[in-house]
Every structure is written in C-alpha cells, then in structure tokens.
From Swiss-Prot:
It is found in: Cytoplasm. SUPFAM superfamilies: HD-domain/PDEase-like. Keywords: Aminoacyl-tRNA synthetase, ATP-binding, Cytoplasm, Ligase, Nucleotide-binding, Protein biosynthesis. This is Glycine--tRNA ligase beta subunit. HAMAP family: Gly_tRNA_synth_beta (MF_00255). Tetramer of two alpha and two beta subunits. One of its GO terms (cellular component) is cytosol. Its EC number is 6.1.1.14. It comes from the Bacteria. One of its GO terms (biological process) is glycyl-tRNA aminoacylation. The gene is glyS. It comes from Coxiella burnetii (strain RSA 331 / Henzerling II). InterPro entries: DALR_anticod-bd, Gly-tRNA-synth_bsu, Gly-tRNA-synth_heterodimer.
Amino acid sequence: MTTQDFLLEIGCEELPPRRLNQLSQALSQTIKSELEKADLSFENIHRYATPRRLAVLVNNLALQQPQRKIERQGPSVKAAFDKDQTPTLACFGFAQSCGVSTAQLKVKKTKKGEFIYCEIEQPGQNTLDLLPNIIQSALKQLPTPKAMRWGDHKEFFVRPVHWIILMLGKDLVPATLLGKMASCETRGHRFHHPKNILVTKPDDYQKLLLTHGMVIADFEKRREKIRDLIQKAASEKGEAIIDEGLLEEVTGMVEWPVILVGNFKAEFLELPPEVLITTMKVHQRTFPIKNKNGDLLPYFIIVSNIESKNPKRVIVGNERVINARLADASFFYDNDLRTSLENRLPKLGDVIFQRQLGTLADKARRIEKLAAFIAKQINIDEQLAARAGLLSKCDLVSEMVYEFPTLQGIMGYYYAFHDKEPPLVAEAIKEHYLPRFSGDQLPRNLLSPCVAVADRIDTIIGIIGINKSPTGDKDPFALRRAALGILRILIEKELSLDLFALLNEAKNNYAVELPNVNVVNQSFDFIIERLRAWYLEKEVPASVFMAVLASHPDDPLDFDRRIKAVQHFQTLPEADALAAANKRVSNILKKQAAELKSKTIDHSLFDSDAEHLLADQLKERAELVNNLYKKADYTKALSELASLKEPIDIFFDKVMVMVDDKEKRENRLALLSSLQQLFSQIADISLLS
C-alpha cells in the first residue's frame, strides 16, 4: 500500500503554558482516533508543542482507504417477489440501482422481517479528500473549556490562529481550518527568526525549525534540554531545586531556552525556605539553588526565551523583581508574627466554610473535638491533638497565606513554633494537609493523622449531610480525594479506627441539624466505595474485595488485613476447592434458612464417620482460629482453615444433607452453618468461586 507522511501544524498566539503538553497529547490522540475510525493505517504519530504552535506528524499514512464490502438493504421479500417468486418491479429497480442482476441479490432475516440485500464492493476514498474533515473532527474534541473567537471568524480555538500547515507528502492539502487557508509555511522564533520557513516535506519539519527557526519543537526534548541546562548552570554554585510542575510550565513558555543565573539579598535567607521557593516560583518562574546540606543559597536560575545581546540586563531585571517580592514576603511574615495563631481564631469566624455548615471557626472547633476523639482511640495525647486541631486553620487568615495559598499549613508550622506551641502540635498543623494528592507522602508522626483524619471526616459528613455528594466527574469539595486520604493514612500508618463510630462522632459535633438523616450510612458507603476504587488501582480482584465486604468490617485497617489474608489464601492449593465448597454450603443454607433457627449440633444424631470427622475438625480448628481472629491474624487463620478441605470433601462425598429425617437434616444443616460461620468471620470465601 502506498503511504506518505502527513503534517499538521496550528500556529497561534501564545498558548497557556500549564496546559500546553495536555493540549498536545489530546490533539495527537484525537487525530489518531479519527484516522483509525476512517480505517486509514499509519506507522506512528509524533507530536510537537511550543508556545506558538501545536503540530502532529503522522508517519507512513495510507493514501487510500482499503476496499470494503457493504450490505445495502432493499425492499422486503414480500414486496420484491410475487406469489410465484418472480421478481417484481421493486426488485428489478433495487438490483439496477446496485448494478447487479436480481439473481445476485440475497435474503436476510431481521427483527422486522425478511428483506433482500446486495453486497457491494465499495472502493476506499483518497486520504487527501478525507483529511480536512478528519482534522476538523479532531479539533472539535480538544479539551478547550476557555476557547476564544477573534476578528470576524466564527471558529473557536484556545488562542487566535495565524497560520496552518496541512501537508501529505510534498503536497498541500487544500483546506481552510480555523479561518486560515492551509499552506506549507511555518514560522520560526518570534524574535530570532520571525520570517516564514518553507517546509518541503513533513519529515523535515522538526529539523527545519531547529536549524532555521531557532525552535526546539519537541516538548519532551525541550523539557529535558532545559533540565540539563539548569543543572549545569547551578553546579557552579550548588544544586538546583527543580520543581517538576514549574519545569513543565517553563517548557511551555519558551521555544529556545537560554539559562541565566541571578542572585538576591542574602538577608532574605532568614525567611522560611518555603517562602523563598514559592516567591521565586510563583512570581518569576525561577529555580532556587541549594548547597550540599540542602540549605538555600542566594541564587536562582532564570529560563529565558531569547539570546539577549545584553544578558546582564535580563538578569538585573529579574533580580530587581525577586528582591522586591521577597521584601514584600518579609513584610508579610513579620506582620504575621505579631499575632499568635490562637489570637487569629476570632478572625476565622469571618470566613465561611460552607453557608449551611458555618464558618472556619466552627470547623476548627469541630476538628478540635474529633482529633481528641481519634487520639483517644489510638492512645495519643488527647490534649495535644485537640490543640493541633483547634489551631490547624488559623494560618488561613494570615497575610502570607492570603498571598500564597499553597503555603497553608506550612506557615502555621512556623507561626506555631514562634508561639512556643509544642513541636508535635506545630508539625501536625503542617502535616494535616497530607496527602494532598494521589501518591503524596503521608504525615510522619502519629499526632498529625488525628488532625488530618478529623479534618477530612468533618468535611465528608458535612457536605454529604447537606446532600451535596459528588456526582459524576463533579466533586467541588474534593470529597473523593479526602476519602482516599483517610484510607491511606489509616491503612498505611496502621491505625485501627471504627469508621462508623468516627462518622457518628463527627455528625454529633455539628451544632446544626444536618438535613440528610442517613448521612452516616451514606458517608460510610462513600468511603468504602473509594476503598474499592483504590484496591482496583492496586489490581486487587473485585471478587476478593466483595468477599471481604460481605463480612462488614468497620475498620479500614482491619479491612486491608482481610484483603491480604484472602489474597494469600488464593495462593494455597486448597483454595479453589474450599471456595467451591463454601459456595455449595451457602446455596444449601439459603434455601433452608427456615430450618436453621437456633439449631445446635447434636453428635448423637450422626450416623456416619464423615459427620464425626467434620464436626471434630471444626471444633479443633474453631478454638485455634478464634484466637487468631482476636489477634487479627487472618492470614494464618485462613491457612489453618485450609486444612478442612479433606473432611469437607469426605462429608459431601459420603453424606446426604437433605434427608427425609427432619432431625438429622436440621443437624447436618447446623453443621454446615457452623462451617460457614467459621470462614465468614474473615470473608465470604464462596464469592471467590
């Protein structure tokens, strides 16, 4: 099959740097999807993205669709043939329209009856003719929530478009996209090479931009180039602190990266390092430098988009701004230190947490109580937990956090130390926001989780309590993230807490009556659903999760131990047979539930060795296994129960359960019930079958 390379480039005004890589990935994916939908084969797709362009290069794109067989349906059999099965005019007309004889027509049965149809060989369309619509369709699928219109154009895009390249091989694809006629000309760097550059073939695109236009078109290559340049420049002073989010953003801001090193006044090093780093990152998009001990140095890395004739001027300009911003930060910090965290509590009363749920002051009081409740359950100092909970939100009304919201908790930590609060309280104020996202670090000490869990539980109970649970992909209060944070803290820090009791306590802490009367149950189910999703991500089979869920554990840590025990059980050679046996037992007992009311096992009614063997083995194992249950050693307990495989197999081979003798039947059902109960204390093993 004949193939050619295809190139699309959309040249526009500066694209949002934080979303540039995402847009590039989306464009590449939608074009790939549309080409596959059109049945056009290709070898691979390369994507390019700079502040002024999005581009896609498709290698070895087929120049034509493959020939396809299509079925064209005609009139019903009743209309196509008369009583003598002679073709009617309708049949002849349909055959003629298909270009075949009536003898070549076929009959097909459908839900609506029998119809005649014709198989037609449809030649594939030329790729050149299909591409404009393919690209149009791909562009409509781009995630552009804030698309713009410009001039008198009706088209929308992320930014106003200035040029379009559409090339198939060496040929121009004649089309108008986003209000621009396609051409074979791109543009280089806005300042270093603003003139047009002729692209003679798609495969030359990246090289032409690099050698003629001073543009590194490949986003990943440009990002790694910037990383290397930063590290090299910083090595003369120390080591660069490279924030991956900032690196991604800066990569989206430059086409030809040039690295410069500036410095700021050493006196500002007295500020908390997070303040310095955030100021440099947020205001000037610069990278700090640290020494071998991890201490900040009074230097920073600038990533410029031009090779200036006077780089010193660029450096001085950045230094002036950085020093001014740090002077502001120093002013905010000194001002904040004049008021203790505790004295900021009244000001929290002026900040609404949620209209129906009160102010941040109300929330702080609830966290105080709930953190103390949690501390008592896990044997942590209740007074310290209460103190940390009470002060946890006070830095939100500080000048520094108002200026830099990402420093919430961090500034509270420094202010708490200044106020001579206990070190554990200060750490808890900082760490109670952890984990902030999936995979983030957890709080380090055991006081911090008390506040972290209390804060999240309070939010979940409150928001679900006013009937504002997340729906679909909408989760404005980040309840899913909060639930996952709770679960990770409790499970990974190995903290045993009764989730129902915790949710009830949180509900009772609200001074207002929550409209949702079923809030505790719904909140519990919501958190357990997040637990299910978490295990799914960790590739725990759904059957394992459902088996444990059937035993209704209220403690997430206990739930996790059961999950691990069941997973280990599945590796045992007896697992499949025992799961099948438990399923058989479960089915029998469901049908005979009425005969099981308070029935105890009577050994005198046994009339076979198989019954005695199973009963004796159950009694022997029950005592051992129940002790293991108390220690939450579920893995060993299930391993012990695996030894019941042989007596269970013998029982089902030798004993008829549903005999006519009522006493014997009920006695055997009671024996099976005790077997089921022994397993179900950990999980419903029958669900593994």
